Curated annotation (Swiss-Prot):
This is Extensin. It comes from Sorghum bicolor (Sorghum). Residues 36-45, 70-264, 272-283 have a biased composition (Pro residues). Residues 46-69 have a biased composition (Basic and acidic residues). Residues 27-283 are annotated as: Disordered.
Length: 283
C-alpha cells in the first residue's frame, strides 16, 4: 500500500512540472509569449526659419545643410531569463522495515523411553507459632459540643381570607318550542290557460302618389325699369325729439330687381314616377 502511494505522488509531481513548463512556453510564466516592443521613430526637431528675401525676383540664399545626426538604432533590452524552476524535492520512497523472522527452533529429539518422574520427598509441614496480637486500649473520641440554636421568634402571619367561590347559577333554558306542523297549501285546479287569439293589426292604407300639377308659367313680360317689383320698405322714422332735425336724407333709388329664370320641366318622364319639384323662385 505504501509503495503504491509513493508511485502516485511521483506521478503527480511529474504532471505539475510538465504543466508549469507548458505555461512558461505559452507566455503565462516568466516573460514568455510577449511581443517584442517596436522601436519608436526619433523625434523631429524644429524647422529652420526662412531668411527674408532681398527683393523682387531674387532667390533667397539657401542655408547650409545641417548634417542631421543619425538616430541611434534601437536595440530592445534583452528579456530577463526566467529563473529555473526549483525542482520539488522528491519524497523519499518508503521502504518497509524488514520484519524480524521468528527463530526456528529445532525439534527436540524424541526420547525413546520417557524418564520416570520421581517426586522429591516433601518436608514435614511445620506450622509457625501463632502469637496473639495485643489490642490497643480503646480510646473514645471526644464528644463534640452540642449546638443549641437560639430560639426564633414565632412568625405570625395575618390570616389570608379565602375568597368565596361564586355561586354558579345556570342560565335558564328557553322553553322548547315545537316546530309548526306544515299544512300543505291547497293546489289550484289544473286548468290549462287558453292561448290568446291573435288578431292582426289593420294595415294603414297606402298613400297614393301626389299628382304633379305644373305651375302655370307667368307671361314673359319684362318689368318696367321705373317701378321696382319689390318696393323698399319705408325707412324707420326716428322717435320724436324735443328739437326734430331739420335735415332729412333723400330716399335712395332701389336697384332694379333681376328677372327670375324661367323653369322648363323635363319632357321625358314616366307617368308612374312623379317629376321632380320645381326649384324655388329666385328673387
Amino acid at each position: 500500500m505504501m509503495g503504491g502511494k509513493a508511485a502516485l505522488l511521483l506521478a503527480l509531481v511529474a504532471v505539475t512540472l510538465a504543466v508549469v513548463e507548458i505555461q512558461a512556453d505559452a507566455g503565462y510564466g516568466y516573460g514568455g509569449g510577449y511581443p517584442t516592443p517596436t522601436p519608436k521613430p526619433p523625434a523631429k526637431g524644429p524647422k529652420p526659419e526662412k531668411p527674408p528675401t532681398k527683393g523682387h525676383g531674387h532667390k533667397p540664399e539657401k542655408p547650409p545643410k545641417e548634417h542631421k545626426p543619425t538616430p541611434p538604432t534601437y536595440t530592445p533590452s534583452p528579456k530577463p531569463t526566467p529563473p529555473p524552476a526549483t525542482p520539488k524535492p522528491t519524497p523519499p520512497t518508503y521502504t518497509p522495515s524488514p520484519k524480524p523472522k521468528s527463530p526456528v527452533y529445532p525439534p527436540p529429539p524424541k526420547a525413546s523411553t520417557p524418564p520416570t518422574y520421581t517426586p522429591s520427598p516433601k518436608p514435614p509441614a511445620t506450622k509457625p507459632p501463632t502469637y496473639p496480637t495485643p489490642k490497643p486500649p480503646a480510646t473514645k473520641p471526644p464528644t463534640p459540643p452540642v449546638y443549641t440554636p437560639s430560639p426564633k421568634p414565632p412568625v405570625t402571619k395575618p390570616p389570608t381570607p379565602k375568597p368565596t367561590p361564586p355561586v354558579y347559577t345556570p342560565n335558564p333554558k328557553p322553553p322548547v318550542t315545537k316546530p309548526p306542523t306544515h299544512t300543505p297549501s291547497p293546489k289550484p285546479p289544473t286548468s290549462k290557460p287558453t292561448p290568446p287569439v291573435y288578431t292582426p293589426s289593420p294595415k294603414p292604407p297606402k298613400p297614393s302618389p301626389p299628382t304633379y300639377t305644373p305651375t302655370p308659367k307667368p307671361p314673359a313680360t319684362k318689368p318696367p325699369t321705373s317701378t321696382p317689383t319689390h318696393p323698399k320698405p319705408t325707412p324707420h322714422t326716428p322717435y320724436p325729439q324735443a328739437h326734430p332735425p331739420t335735415y332729412k336724407p333723400a330716399p335712395k333709388p332701389s336697384p332694379p330687381a333681376p328677372t327670375p329664370p324661367t323653369y322648363t320641366p323635363p319632357v321625358s318622364h314616366t307617368p308612374s314616377s312623379p317629376p321632380p319639384p320645381p326649384p324655388p323662385p329666385y328673387y
